[in-house]
């Protein structure tokens, strides 16, 4: 049996974020197109070289991109919306689709399955000419071969996943458009095969959540492609979950190899292999190293997995690979020497994961004795962090054990609470507020940097934050907002800020991952038991409240969002980590309330995106996610108003969960898809406080009062005015002051006009 090492995809951003810097330099005209292309080629080839040096045999080619791999596929297949027709050059069209321009709205962006990466949504239009516009995978395959002598493994997004992720067609059109994709995919694969590609990876992550009818439809497309390209060696790659429900059919697809995720879909895929075996004439590609987290693998567990598989399958060959692309992990841990030894040793970023694949390959081909020293090291590392004081806090254990049913619910139902809150807060009909943050100007960022570098003292920094807070409290009063915020000038990031103030978190210096386009994030590492230390938001919020007679909201990030936007320890269930965060936040909320703060917002923008891919697994996730929010927020008095904020994503999927959160008011980011959301509310009632974003904060445009009034008017057709709030769709941190003030003035005027109309019609 031949066994090879393979990688599914490598991080794009560069060890020092060279990729990001090159992109942004090009966008700001600091480098020209030739310099941009030359630098990008250097980065791309360097990534191939690293994987070659690490000992990976099947090196992915074509996973590199200038923005997003789904956008690459859309451009390649001619899915270019007509509004971009005036652009002529490849890069102009490509980046206009990704980012928009002064006169062109960008294509929509959304989360890549249940990860924290975002892709550009392909758009189908009537009359679209689907064809192979550009065989980019072929160019990159030939480049690696000529420049480095690497016979790589081209990686392409499969036709079924691509079209399922696209928008702009009706369900009735889907089958017809899918058939139109056969010809360009045939041409793409034929040209790759003719150029010498030994194996071509076709990614179909959507296969983890298809119906039986959809799998059959996908199979017919692959049969049509295979008929035209009979000799190409295709690896059908699935990831992010198991394909258990459709495994029996998927293993009959006309492909040479099938890749399965034995990390996030381990139980389901093992069950399926045990029940149905695996075809002897196909290669099984085993996703055995977690491509979505940063922890060293348990090599003993991985080798046990292979022992199990080798007993159950008769396949001629095996491939050892990560569970998914390493796009979701930082590149290399070597710079993280500031971390404690026990934590540093327990980490494995992308380059370390490649080394783990090679170790497993050695054990499988030469016996475990060939890596006996490494196995012993790994066992010691796991034992050290498992038994560390950080992971075994008695106070955290005791708090969890002491939880009772009443800790997860408010004393009174919403209607009665809301009445008490109206009396206590004295807010008008259709109250106005913002989501939390105000512009983080160059001065704000520079002052924070000087403070962190020790150039200015704590006292000087605090005085600066107070000055900014007072300035924006006055702005809000002048604008006429009803519920104010302190502005969050002390915060760099809504998760990092809290992680820095809670026990159990650590932070990397260079642990960057791509979020979307050139935007990179550095997720906190939850490595130990999470616990409250000291007040995190009290000082700034209480100071802001002291400046005004109006109500000031406390602002916190919710437990599920902190969890979903961090790298999370993998030795206990995510539910338990979420409860630990919730208990810490509960303490903070109680402190805010006892300090006189009567409205407290606990944001959960990432609640939906943490949901499992399979609908059958949703209930279990939603149950503990909702319980986490309730645990954090349920100890306050009935008169204290709890708000939450969410980013809109398939509201219908989670409307029951949103109700169960029992927040007094929810604000939802809907400005880009307001019509869809209004339609949803026509047949899905929501009977609690709700604010639908009345303008898009992601655009520098200042919308008119009339535009916002129209949205309020539409919203009031499906929302009870008694419970309706008026707000922007998200925080205003990234906007400029000269954009924010007029936009909020228009919003307040729209609210006043709406109140007048309601009074007239009463």
From Swiss-Prot:
Glycoprotein is among the record's keywords: no
The enzyme's E.C. designation: 2.1.1.14
Sorted UniProt keywords: Amino-acid biosynthesis, Metal-binding, Methionine biosynthesis, Methyltransferase, Repeat, Transferase, Zinc
Protein name: 5-methyltetrahydropteroyltriglutamate--homocysteine methyltransferase
Pfam families, A to Z: Meth_synt_1, Meth_synt_2
Function: Catalyzes the transfer of a methyl group from 5-methyltetrahydrofolate to homocysteine resulting in methionine formation.
Keyword Protein biosynthesis included in the entry's annotation: no
GN (gene name): metE
Sequence positions that bind L-methionine: 435-437, 488, 603
Positions with a binding annotation for Zn(2+): 645, 647, 669, 730
Active site residues of this protein: 698 (proton donor)
UniProt xrefs under CDD domains: CIMS_C_terminal_like, CIMS_N_terminal_like
SUPFAM superfamilies (UniProt xref): UROD/MetE-like
A GO molecular-function annotation: 5-methyltetrahydropteroyltriglutamate-homocysteine S-methyltransferase activity
